Amino acid sequence: MNPLRSIQHNITTPPISGGQPLDAVGPQAQQSHPKRISPSQLSQSAHQALERLSANAEHQRLASLVRNALQDGTFQFQSSNHTQVTYKASICLPADTDTVRTDHLINNELTVQARLNDQSEYDIVSAHLHGSSKAISFDVPSPPPAHGSASSVLSERTHLGMSSVLSQDAVDSSSLETPLVSSPDHSRPPSQPKPVHIGSVRRDSGSLVSDNPVVQALLSFVQADQAFPPQAASIAGVQLEMRSRRDIEQALEELKGAFTVEKAQLMSGGSSSERVDEDVNADIHIPLLLKAIERGAGAFGPGALIEIADGGQISAKAFLASCAPTITSNDDVLSEFINQKLKGDDDLQVRLGAQELLHVATKKEFQLGGLAGSIGVSSILGSAWELGASELLKNAIFGKNFSPSQYALQLAGIDSVPPFIIEAMDSFCVLVIIKGMKGELWSMKDLLPKALKAGAISSAMSFPNNVLQYAGFKSRVADLAANSITTEAAIFGAASGIPPEVKESEELMRAGLFQSMKDGVMAHPGEGMDTKETIERMTRHALDIAPGESTAVKSMGLAAIVGMIPLIASSKATGLVSEQILRIFRNAVFNPIEAIALNALALGGRVNVPGLFDSDNAKHARVAQTILARASQHMEAGDREISAEELHQMLAPRSEFLRHVGSAIVNGMNASFEAIPALVRKLGYGEAPLAERIPYQDLAVPDTSRQPAP
């Protein structure tokens, strides 16, 4: 007879209840098993296995009951055989307790089968709960097997034998176990999202506390007016997780689609009293989510409705509440209590749902394609021009051994032509990166004119700096000052595609917010509030955290600083490497600095250095913590308002140096670009820009004729 087959048979045999004692034979019988088993007698593998099984919703209750019984010392020795030992505890659950989604269990018998390992610690093999009408069980995966021993086969079979069974017959347990392949890597279902916040929970002076600030804020809210049940977190090793209850990225796309403003009623160019519908396709989801975090359901008007798949409509309030996180724990008493508390607070669910969506909406993604295109264009075309084509063309025009100072203007003009081509292509790549970060589709028809305009500006802005390369000042100080100014001008010219893009986003968002308030989608600012100032502030706060625009603005600040390095270090670097190497390096690294900066900043948002700068995740965690803390302080929804400035300070701190530098550059460049068109308009030609045609005065009285019925 194969001894291993005998062992395997015993593992897969259904557990024997306390009413059917086993004869104590074999190695386990020779051991002196304690009358009661406690957590300290379990192996580390047993604790880890229970934690893994607790991640499964169907096993949470049973795993929690096992932990509680171990902690309370209610498991008593029942029987043992040559492979395992059985302990039993009597469990009395209240009639309204939902045990793993089965019928209510009142009189219950909890048994565990354990095996003594080589370290004289107990590995839990399986656990079973027998009720008045149903039985629930699971097998626990075993720890790693020993080398080449019978226990290796034993471990493999118990690992493959994990089961979850609901049976109508609590007495005849012979059909309770159905093999189910499982492993630690599969303890979380593939469709289950990763936790947004996770923390350990323990009892301290009668209250529950956590090492995670957000989880601690959640616990504080729940126990602000009601204590946790004594069964909650009554044992060590309890963890609590806040998870998205739905596909947040898909929900965000649904929100964008529902609240994109396609047309806005603006003033016509000829008359301030006449209104015309103009295509804007304004994306307002970020300011809308910010306002929902600030004011909860009070952020919306009666027109804030979202169409669902069956053709019906739900309110924005209900939609955001459906995006609020759900709570899971290896202690299901704890998770059920918290979830029940959250379900009773609609305002809190709206704010938490908005925060979940805002976190995804402001996530910055690395844009490899645009970066590769920018570096490729700058390094290949730029190096080809500087290392070969430039000298050949100039020699062909002026002859060999010509005097650069004699033809300074002509040479500078020739050197200003390549930037038109190179920077136009580079600007195209930069605009593609910005569109990608915003999650928007782009077209050649839309981006090419903008890129060509940026190339022309870059060509013109590079001319002064090119002149100084051939005819500098005699004074070293004057020459350095002039080179610094013209170098910065050339840098700004090379990035001239960014400021108009940011300005366009700003104008469209303002128009979209205006129209959404007019249509009753977003709540009216209220009496005594300056609507123009309110909309401008909402737009500014939104763009300061929008993934495309905020990163683009910061990249301007970074480019202005980094772009000066070649000028400052050129004299020192020339003595170390050849001029050709320096030119190749400059074209590959410093010329495409905007594209590099955009992606570097996107990656930098993932880095968290406490006390120095926060990652994007840390900023949003602080927002969630504030929402929960405010709810703890004010149980009434109307008293929980978070000010716009307070929220903005959390997501876009004043300490963001690059944002301030970049904003100054972008605003200055846009003002200079607008100077000539503004002068032309004063002479009576041209149309006012979109921002000047928004009729804020129309919001003095809400336009009820365009609002759907509540």
Swiss-Prot record:
Positions of the region Disordered?
1-36, 136-155, 173-207
Composition bias (Polar residues) maps to: 1-15
Listed under GO cellular component are:
extracellular region
Q: Where on the tree of life does the source sit, at the highest rank?
A: Bacteria
Transmembrane stretches, start-end: none
Listed A to Z, the keywords are: Hypersensitive response elicitation, Secreted, Virulence
Q: What are the GO BP annotations of this UniProt entry?
A: symbiont-mediated perturbation of host programmed cell death
Location in the cell: Secreted
Task performed by this protein: Effector protein involved in non-host recognition and able to elicit hypersensitive response (HR).
Q: What is this protein called?
A: Effector protein AvrPphD
Q: Which organism is it from?
A: Pseudomonas savastanoi pv. phaseolicola (Pseudomonas syringae pv. phaseolicola)
Q: What is the lineage of its organism?
A: Bacteria, Pseudomonadati, Pseudomonadota, Gammaproteobacteria, Pseudomonadales
